[in-house]
Amino acid sequence: MTNQAEEKRILIMAGGTGGHVFPALAVAKYLSQQGWKVRWLGTAERMEARLVPQHGFDIDFIDIKGVRGNGLMRKLAAPFKILRSVMQARAVIKSFKPDVVMGMGGFASGPGGVAAKLSGIPLVLHEQNAIPGMTNRLLSRIASEVLCAFEGTFTDIKAETVGNPIRKELIALGDKRESCCDDDSLKVLVVGGSLGAKIFNDVMPSVLEGVSKTHSMTVWHQVGRDNLVAVKAEYQRLGQDGSVSVAEFIDDMEAAYRWADVVVCRSGALTVSELAAVGLPSLLVPYPHAVDDHQTKNAKVLVNAGAAFLLPQPIVDTSKLMTKLSMLASDKQELCNMGQRARDVAILDATERVANVCIRLAEKG
């Protein structure tokens, strides 16, 4: 069922979170520049429905909502809903005739992966996290190629470590990053995701107040939706509003990374890979409710390299963060060393590696 036209085609399944969608977009853009026709498979309610068309790619939707749940009726209905979504995915494959199907996570990957296998189309999986999700664990048994971002992600099957595809602008930023702390003030970027991280919003105003008594420190704090007024008021109450920029969202992360000397953040897979690529030291506070605690495993990639500090959320307080940031403010050379160690573990050609696997499978026919 391989497409006989000269133009190669790929159907990409990635959705739900930016950690799935953005790496997939990097691969999609690369293959598109190589003359490939790219189409997406996702769900209408998740972020891929908005993001993918914004980047110029067509998307088809399958209906798999309601599969998860604890109610008896949902459990009884689940097999039928999964079967229906597989049939919907097969219809897309029959119409589009891809040479390769690639799954990078999200609800559509499961049905789409099964449909690819039933249709005789090569299936490539890419796992972004250091611990594989349930869908990729199951699909890995039927995939043509299994790829992962971090060494040791899959322990019972053959998998190739290729890194996480990230935007080429961030790789270029890391290439240009020649020094850190080029002035006296320690510049701290605090990123809590689109909803913010309550722990950061609660403690960072006091951290800035405490560190500023002995060191010069400025903060760029992304607080998330609906948190701007309260967090800004707390910085102001503590007399720190002149040393902080508070924003609900940071649209230009390239500019934020360029500005920062150190980052305080969660440890999602894409974040960890971006920190490595741009060569930034970090204080990582894994999201404690992540499935299988995969963010802690992600963080250890940088921590074990000496590029980051791991701070489990239950022990995070003003004192802990003050101690770490004061230490870095006092030792600029170590700050630079940590940034270099982060860069040393980066896999900078991840996009090309993933794309080349797809190209190789398509050429095999």
From Swiss-Prot:
Keywords: Cell cycle, Cell division, Cell inner membrane, Cell membrane, Cell shape, Cell wall biogenesis/degradation, Glycosyltransferase, Membrane, Peptidoglycan synthesis, Transferase. Pathway: Cell wall biogenesis; peptidoglycan biosynthesis. Transmembrane segments: none annotated. Its main location: membrane. One of its GO terms (molecular function) is UDP-N-acetyl-D-glucosamine:N-acetylmuramoyl-L-alanyl-D-glutamyl-meso-2,6-diaminopimelyl-D-alanyl-D-alanine-diphosphoundecaprenol 4-beta-N-acetylglucosaminlytransferase activity. SUPFAM superfamilies: UDP-Glycosyltransferase/glycogen phosphorylase (SSF53756). One of its GO terms (cellular component) is plasma membrane. It is an enzyme of class 2 (transferase). It catalyses: di-trans,octa-cis-undecaprenyl diphospho-N-acetyl-alpha-D-muramoyl-L-alanyl-D-glutamyl-meso-2,6-diaminopimeloyl-D-alanyl-D-alanine + UDP-N-acetyl-alpha-D-glucosamine = di-trans,octa-cis-undecaprenyl diphospho-[N-acetyl-alpha-D-glucosaminyl-(1->4)]-N-acetyl-alpha-D-muramoyl-L-alanyl-D-glutamyl-meso-2,6-diaminopimeloyl-D-alanyl-D-alanine + UDP + H(+). InterPro entries: GlcNAc_MurG, Glyco_trans_28_C, GlycoTrans_28_N. UDP-N-acetyl-alpha-D-glucosamine binds at residues 17-19, 129, 167, 194, 250, 269-274, 295. It is a peripheral membrane protein. Its EC number is 2.4.1.227. GO terms for biological process: carbohydrate metabolic process; cell division; cell wall organization; lipid glycosylation; peptidoglycan biosynthetic process; regulation of cell shape. It is found in: Cell inner membrane. Belongs to the glycosyltransferase 28 family. MurG subfamily. Cell wall formation. Catalyzes the transfer of a GlcNAc subunit on undecaprenyl-pyrophosphoryl-MurNAc-pentapeptide (lipid intermediate I) to form undecaprenyl-pyrophosphoryl-MurNAc-(pentapeptide)GlcNAc (lipid intermediate II). This is UDP-N-acetylglucosamine--N-acetylmuramyl-(pentapeptide) pyrophosphoryl-undecaprenol N-acetylglucosamine transferase. The lineage of its organism: Bacteria, Pseudomonadati, Pseudomonadota, Gammaproteobacteria, Alteromonadales. The gene is murG.
